[in-house]
Amino acid sequence: MAQFQVYRAPGGRLVLDLQTDLIDTGSRVVASLVPASSGPKAIGRLEPVFTIEGAAYVLHTAEMAAVPSALLTQGAPVADLSGSDYEIRGALDIVFSGF
C-alpha cells in the first residue's frame, strides 16, 4: 500500500490512504472522497477537490479514520494522488495545526 493512493472501500465509496508507507500496523488512516456534486461547497484548503475517473471529488479531511488494511487490499488502487501531496498535506496541517 502506498500513501496517497485512492481505493474503493466495501460499499463503493472512495477513500484516500493518508498513512506513510514506512509503518505497517494492520490498519491504515484514510479520509473519504465524496462526489463534489453530492454535498455542500468544499471548505477551502481543508477540503481539496480532485478529479478521479473524470469526476470531481472532495477530500473530507476532518473525517479521517483508521480502517483495517484488508479493506483496501481487495482491489487495485483507483487513482494515485501522490502528485497532489502539497494540497493533501496542507489539508492535514489545517486539521492538526489550524493553519
Language-model regions: role of each:
Residues 12, 32, 70-74:
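Generic, low-specificity signal for short hydrophobic/alpha-helical stretches with a mild N-terminal bias
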Residues 3-10, 16-49:
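Compact nucleic-acid interaction/catalytic patches
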Residues 53-99:
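C-terminal terminal-subdomain/extension
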Residues 12-13, 55:
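Beta-strand-connecting loop/turn residues
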